[in-house]
């Protein structure tokens, strides 16, 4: 099982009057606007850029026949069946509505989704950790929502200010290291992840010498991965299987880009070997077995 995803459409939908909360009512799926029908037809074609079409569907006002007493029903192709705790749903929905319905920046947000966001699907774990920040009324997440959303959706590289809830545990000359505790049960989407750490370089494109030594020491030499978003992340041994399977879903060009990224050598030989094995089309089970065998204490 790979990482769980949620969609922005699980929380909000667009209408002719603005953005409103999402609702789930399969009985109303039959009602679609002409534009929605055209986009849904195009998403089924061979070679279609499904992520781009999903973004268009998300930014298209829904049929007014799919309005309920709670909100609006997104088309099936842009929503997920992921179970989202009510606390997380309420926090994220209100946060997104404030961002998207803002008179000054709402249009900019929609333009960014169309041109810069890779998709409207994102990590459920990331969303859960944003919800943790939203519980704190003094957190900057309330004022800097657009930038934090962009980092959550992988449209920009994240940093300490735009990450989900975490604690800074170490700072070296070349890196800042943050600790990510398991998400609180009432906010957690899916199974909770173990403790992990991220190292953020002080200067981009510059190797982290002292930071990596600190990261290895703090994490008890956990497997380290570079996902190509400007930082390195540790992976607990029990989660390596899922982490590699999720990474393997990236296309070949993306894996090559990450393999040659300036941070990748800092992740260590095992990570480089994993990238090479994926590019050589080795069986995923073989890759996982080799990495996990080498990673045992």
UniProtKB/Swiss-Prot annotation:
Keywords: ATP-binding, Host cytoplasm, Hydrolase, Magnesium, Metal-binding, Nucleotide-binding, RNA-binding. The keyword Ribonucleoprotein does not apply. The lineage of its organism: Viruses, Riboviria, Orthornavirae, Duplornaviricota, Resentoviricetes. The keyword Metal-binding applies. Its main location: host cell. It comes from the Viruses. One of its GO terms (biological process) is viral genome replication. It is an enzyme of class 3 (hydrolase). GO terms for molecular function: ATP binding; hydrolase activity, acting on acid anhydrides; metal ion binding; RNA binding. Belongs to the rotavirus NSP2 family. One of its GO terms (cellular component) is host cell cytoplasm. Participates in replication and packaging of the viral genome. Plays a crucial role, together with NSP5, in the formation of virus factories (viroplasms) which are large inclusions in the host cytoplasm where replication intermediates are assembled and viral RNA replication takes place. Displays ssRNA binding, NTPase, RNA triphosphatase (RTPase) and ATP-independent helix-unwinding activities. The unwinding activity may prepare and organize plus-strand RNAs for packaging and replication by removing interfering secondary structures. It is found in: Host cytoplasm. The active site is at 231 (for ntpase and rtpase activities). Homooctamer. Interacts with VP1; this interaction is weak. Interacts with NSP5; this interaction leads to up-regulation of NSP5 phosphorylation and formation of viral factories. Its EC number is 3.6.4.-. This is Non-structural protein 2.
């Amino acid at each position: 099982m790979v990482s769980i995803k949620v969609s922005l459409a699980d929380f909000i939908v667009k209408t002719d009057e603005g953005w409103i909360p999402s609702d789930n009512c399969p009985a109303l799926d039959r009602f679609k606007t002409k534009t929605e029908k055209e986009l849904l037809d195009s998403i089924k074609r061979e070679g279609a850029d499904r992520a781009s079409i999903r973004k268009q569907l998300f930014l298209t006002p829904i049929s007014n026949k799919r309005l309920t007493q709670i909100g609006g029903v997104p088309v099936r192709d842009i929503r997920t069946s992921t179970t989202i705790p009510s606390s997380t749903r309420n926090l994220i929905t209100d946060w997104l509505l404030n961002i998207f319905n803002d008179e000054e920046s709402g249009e900019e947000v929609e333009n960014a989704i169309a041109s810069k966001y890779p998709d409207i699907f994102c990590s459920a774990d990331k969303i859960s950790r944003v919800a943790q920040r939203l519980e704190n009324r003094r957190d900057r997440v309330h004022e800097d929502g657009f930038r934090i959303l962009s980092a959550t959706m992988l449209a920009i590289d994240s940093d300490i200010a735009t990450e989900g809830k975490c604690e800074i545990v170490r700072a070296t000359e070349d890196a800042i290291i943050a600790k990510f505790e398991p998400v609180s049960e009432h906010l957690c989407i899916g199974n909770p992840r173990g403790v992990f750490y991220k190292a953020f370089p002080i200067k981009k494109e510059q190797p982290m010498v002292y930071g990596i030594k600190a990261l290895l020491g703090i994490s008890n030499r956990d497997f380290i991965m570079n996902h190509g978003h400007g930082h390195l992340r540790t992976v607990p041994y029990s989660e390596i299987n899922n982490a590699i399977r999720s990474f393997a879903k990236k296309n070949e060009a993306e894996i090559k880009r990450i393999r040659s990224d300036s941070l990748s050598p800092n992740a260590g030989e095992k990570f480089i070997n994993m990238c090479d094995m994926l590019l050589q089309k080795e069986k995923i089970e073989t890759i996982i077995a080799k990495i996990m065998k080498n990673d045992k204490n």
